[in-house]
């Protein structure tokens, strides 16, 4: 017998660990430019205080202008070419205006604070990206490939589905796959956020980037390197970061008109007093101050940093929010609709009984052959129960959403359907189905060429965290969750009672689920649908927003859903809703903070004497505070651990 992991040549040097210090900050270009501008400003200030010649002082301050202002100026000019008015350009014009009246110090201060504010924005964005992209560094670059009784070290990027790799104790797993040998416990916290290691045995799935425990494993690769869970997490969050929230789109829509209004008001503040003989210097100074403090920099930053930080935080805990719009919509949730199998239950049903109606019929074998391409948990349970026996090949496979499956097996049309989809009058079939359902199980009828040959009973178990999750959802939404299922009324009612759900709608086809969701939403109720099967996709598409239980979820469901959970816990649903609501509160707080700062500074400038340096500090300071406030949602404290009470 071949050892699980015989001696093997040492792996090439691994990639260097990413530094944990703040050294990465210097990789952000805007940080370097802001630091250089600050250095020039401080040097100019020192020269001014020491009585250096004016030419030297001006040279240093103007150099600060160039270093700190060239990039926003270029961005503003390009925007102007596209007939849009960028806030950055207003800041540069104000700084130049200050220099023209001899206030080069104030203009340089504006440039430094503005450059620092922009650098902090970029740091916020980069930190959000790094918090997600850092997951890619968890996956090792090399793997130990097993083949023909020997082992060799290969690049993890060269692994393909079907390859078998060896994972030693303490090593990181280099690919997504299924355990085919050995047993261990795996630390999956980097992917799913689960705090405790998960036991892994033959048949269990493992993910790239997770850490093997004390046992050795043989793993059959099941996904291409670009399609691993960790790679898809990064891809999804990157795509989400490129989207814009509804609030942000509205802000950007009015920003152009508002900015144009600021320019018009600035020109009016400059020209009207001059027409009545006002002093040029003081009038220009007031107008420039107005342009600075009225600019909507903080308002523009109020929305996206909190939402993107929340998306990054959720991804670290095994929940992928596909867009900023989805994060906003999660916060709107009024009612949560749950599927049963694979959502409220563990999605791992087992065969409880097999009844043969025709002597000699291989009921389980026929059903397993027809179900071998099915993604439904009941189908997978039937296939798993037939493991170890010879199952014939099936062709012409057709999924019948909400009803069952059909396939051609050994020249016969075999169907595995729900009792509701069985149109026959066989009394024995009805009797056996009723007995299974009375016990709280789920029955399926096996047909061969239209004739019933057997009945299979399956039983599923409630997720351990389901009752607590249902209670949390009711507390969050102020409305008890609803259960929509295609299963029989007895089984659905029994399970719903265990979970604490009173509103149960059973024996629904996919279009029936969608119709129920649409009915709920007619009175402007925002419905969140949580499901995992193909038959949940229509209801998800009809809902305000949707979550797919992605670990066992069907591909169509995962594609349709706005949110995908990798962590196999129903408690992540109230947790991500609570995070979305916290993000919304931060957005509102940011908008109030930004609006209050702009209003206060504008009124002070119009009806008082607002010094330019104070206006600059107040305006840019509020912008920085808004950006930093959004970054708070990157903290693990912002995520409510499953089991905690959401607010």
Swiss-Prot record:
Task: Please state what is observed when this gene is inactivated.
Answer: Cells lacking this gene are hypersensitive to Co(2+) and Ni(2+) and accumulate these metals in the cytoplasm.
InterPro entries in alphabetical order = ATPase_P-typ_cyto_dom_N, ATPase_P-typ_P_site, ATPase_P-typ_TM_dom_sf, ATPase_P-typ_transduc_dom_A_sf, Cation_Transport_ATPase, HAD-like_sf, HAD_sf, P-typ_ATPase_IB
Q: What class of enzyme is it?
A: translocase
Q: How does it sit in the membrane?
A: Multi-pass membrane protein
Catalysed reactions listed for this entry: Ni(2+)(out) + ATP + H2O = Ni(2+)(in) + ADP + phosphate + H(+); Co(2+)(out) + ATP + H2O = Co(2+)(in) + ADP + phosphate + H(+)
Record-listed E.C. numbers: 7.2.2.-
Which domain of life does the protein's organism represent?
A: Bacteria
Compartments, as annotated in UniProt: Cell membrane
Q: Which SUPFAM superfamilies match?
A: Calcium ATPase, transduction domain A, Calcium ATPase, transmembrane domain M, HAD-like
Name the major location: membrane
Residues bound to Mg(2+) are 532, 536
- Pfam families for this protein: E1-E2_ATPase, Hydrolase
Keyword entries, A-Z: ATP-binding, Cell membrane, Cobalt, Magnesium, Membrane, Metal-binding, Nickel, Nucleotide-binding, Phosphoprotein, Translocase, Transmembrane, Transmembrane helix
Active-site residue list: 339 (4-aspartylphosphate intermediate)
Give the UniProt entry's GO cellular component terms. plasma membrane
Q: Name one GO molecular function term.
A: ATP binding
Q: What induces it?
A: By both Co(2+) and superoxide stress.
Q: NCBIfam families attached here?
A: ATPase-IB_hvy, ATPase_P-type
Name the protein family.
Belongs to the cation transport ATPase (P-type) (TC 3.A.3) family. Type IB subfamily.
Give the protein's biological function: Involved in heavy metal homeostasis. Probably exports nickel and cobalt ions out of the cell.
Annotated protein name in UniProt: Probable cobalt/nickel-exporting P-type ATPase
Organism whose genome encodes this protein: Mycolicibacterium smegmatis (strain ATCC 700084 / mc(2)155) (Mycobacterium smegmatis)
What lineage, starting at the top, does this entry show? Bacteria, Bacillati, Actinomycetota, Actinomycetes, Mycobacteriales
């Amino acid at each position: 017998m071949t050892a699980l992991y015989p001696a093997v040549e040492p792996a090439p040097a691994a990639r260097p660990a990413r530094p944990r210090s703040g050294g990465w900050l210097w990789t952000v270009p805007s940080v370097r430019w802001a630091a250089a501008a600050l250095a020039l400003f401080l040097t100019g200030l020192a020269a001014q205080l020491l009585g250096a010649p004016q030419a030297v002082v001006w040279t240093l301050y103007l150099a600060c202008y160039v270093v700190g202002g060239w990039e926003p100026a270029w961005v503003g000019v390009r925007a102007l070419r596209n007939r849009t008015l960028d806030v950055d350009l207003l800041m540069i014009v104000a700084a130049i205006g200050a220099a023209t009246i001899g206030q080069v110090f104030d203009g340089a201060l504006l440039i430094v604070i503005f450059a620092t504010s922009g650098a902090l924005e970029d740091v916020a964005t980069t930190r959000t990206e790094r918090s997600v992209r850092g997951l890619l560094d968890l996956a090792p670059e090399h793997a130990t490939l097993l083949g023909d009784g020997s082992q060799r070290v290969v690049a993890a990027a060269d692994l393909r589905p079907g390859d078998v790799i060896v994972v030693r104790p303490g090593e990181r797993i280099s690919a997504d796959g299924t355990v085919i040998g050995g047993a261990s416990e795996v630390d999956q916290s980097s992917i799913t956020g689960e705090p405790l290691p998960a036991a892994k045995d033959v048949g269990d799935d493992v993910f790239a980037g997770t850490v093997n425990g004390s046992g050795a494993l043989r793993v059959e690769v099941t996904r291409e390197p670009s399609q691993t869970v960790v790679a898809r997490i990064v891809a999804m969050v990157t795509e989400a970061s490129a989207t814009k929230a509804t609030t942000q789109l509205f802000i950007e829509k009015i920003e152009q008109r508002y900015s144009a209004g600021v320019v018009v008001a600035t020109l009016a503040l400059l020209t009207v007093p001059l027409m009545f003989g006002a002093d040029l210097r003081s009038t220009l100074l007031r107008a420039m101050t107005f342009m600075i403090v009225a600019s909507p920099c903080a308002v523009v930053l109020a929305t996206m940093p909190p939402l993107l930080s929340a998306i990054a935080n959720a991804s670290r805990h095994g929940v992928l929010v596909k867009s900023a719009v989805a994060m906003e919509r999660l916060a709107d949730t009024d009612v949560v609709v749950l599927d049963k199998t694979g959502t409220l239950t563990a999605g791992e049903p087992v065969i409880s009984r097999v009844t043969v109606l025709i002597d000699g019929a291989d009921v389980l074998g026929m059903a397993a052959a027809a179900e071998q391409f099915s993604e439904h948990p009941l189908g997978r349970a039937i296939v798993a129960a037939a493991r170890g026996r010879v199952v014939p090949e099936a062709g012409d496979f057709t999924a019948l959403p909400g009803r069952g499956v059909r396939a051609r097996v050994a020249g016969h049309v075999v169907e595995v359907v729900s009792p509701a989809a069985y149109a026959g009058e066989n009394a024995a079939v009805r009797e056996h189905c009723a007995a299974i359902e009375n016990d709280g199980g789920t029955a399926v009828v096996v047909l061969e060429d239209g004739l019933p040959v057997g009945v299979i009973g399956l039983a599923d178990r409630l997720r351990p965290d389901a009752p607590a999750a249902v209670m949390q959802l009711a507390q969050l939404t102020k409305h008890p969750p609803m259960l929509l299922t295609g299963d029989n009324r007895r089984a659905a009612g029994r399970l719903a009672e265990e979970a604490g759900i009173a509103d149960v709608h059973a024996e629904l086809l996919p279009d029936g689920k969608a119709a129920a969701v649409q009915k709920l939403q007619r009175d402007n109720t925002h419905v969140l649908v949580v499901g995992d099967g193909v038959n949940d996709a229509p209801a998800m598409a009809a809902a305000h927003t949707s979550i797919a239980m992605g670990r066992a979820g069907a591909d169509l469901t995962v594609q349709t859903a706005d949110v995908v959970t990798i962590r196999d816990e129903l408690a992540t649903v109230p947790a991500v809703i609570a995070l979305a609501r916290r993000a919304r509160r931060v957005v509102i707080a940011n908008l109030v903070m930004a609006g209050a700062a702009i209003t206060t500074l504008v009124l002070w400038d119009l009806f008082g004497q607002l010094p330019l340096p104070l206006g600059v500090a107040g305006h840019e300071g509020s912008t920085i505070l808004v950006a930093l406030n959004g970054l708070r949602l990157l903290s693990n404290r912002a995520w409510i651990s499953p089991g905690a009470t959401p607010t």
